[in-house]
Amino acid sequence: EYKGRQTEYVDLIINEMIPMVAAEELADYIDVFCDKGFFTVEDTDRMLNAGMKYGLRAKIHANELDYSGGVQVGVKYNAISVDHLECMGEEEIACLLESETMPTVLPGAAFFLNMPYSPVRKMIQAGLPVALASDYNPGSSPSGNMKFIMSLGCINYKMLPEEVINATTLNSAYAMGVEEEAGSIAVGKLANFYITTPISGIEYLPYAYTADLIEAIFLKGEQY
């Protein structure tokens, strides 16, 4: 309906969709895909600004297809996370180093689309934290298997097992704004954890990428 009329569609989002979503308390975040062929930096700036006025925290999907400027506009609005990041240069890394925004990489999407992977080792060596997520969706990452995501982190990002576990737990909790209540086993936090079958060590989790190692799952202290 709005093909070729992107500005009008952005107006619709700002003037109708965001107010309705906020009024009905349907979302905590506003997430914009700022990338080549999708929303521009200017579009993204307008939508994040509108969402902020309604109390929606900014999140960004950006730099999957090109150096889009999405990282910079996300940091401008103190985005809780910027996701994808296959295209990352010195400018983007420096921008994130001066922010509280969590860089989140999505290896499942790069794997499924056969795209280049994010330069995670370069990001870590520069001093950035990194979160790992599945980007579970039917178009570009049709798997929510986080154990496989951990394996991809080790294989394709050259991350250590300890790094992928940290990236899928505490750093991922930070990327959702729930680090005070989840993401690690600590006094005062929710009892969210799983128990594995007997394994030789934590490095076996990403190593045995097709093995079903989960014996029990606990959410808020309740076993499922």
Model-derived features with residue positions:
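Metal-coordinating catalytic core of metallo-dependent amide/deamination hydrolases
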Residues: E1-G69
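Alpha-helical scaffold segments in soluble metabolic enzymes
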Residues: L12, E16, M20, R46, ...
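Generic structural signal for hydrophobic
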Residues: M20-V21, M47, G51, G74, ...
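Generic beta-strand/beta-sheet core signal
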Residues: F33, H61-N63, T104-L106, A133, ...
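Active-site-adjacent C-terminal substructures of enzyme catalytic domains
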Residues: Y67-E181, Y209, Q223
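C-terminal cap of metal-dependent C-N hydrolases
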Residues: L170, L190-Y224
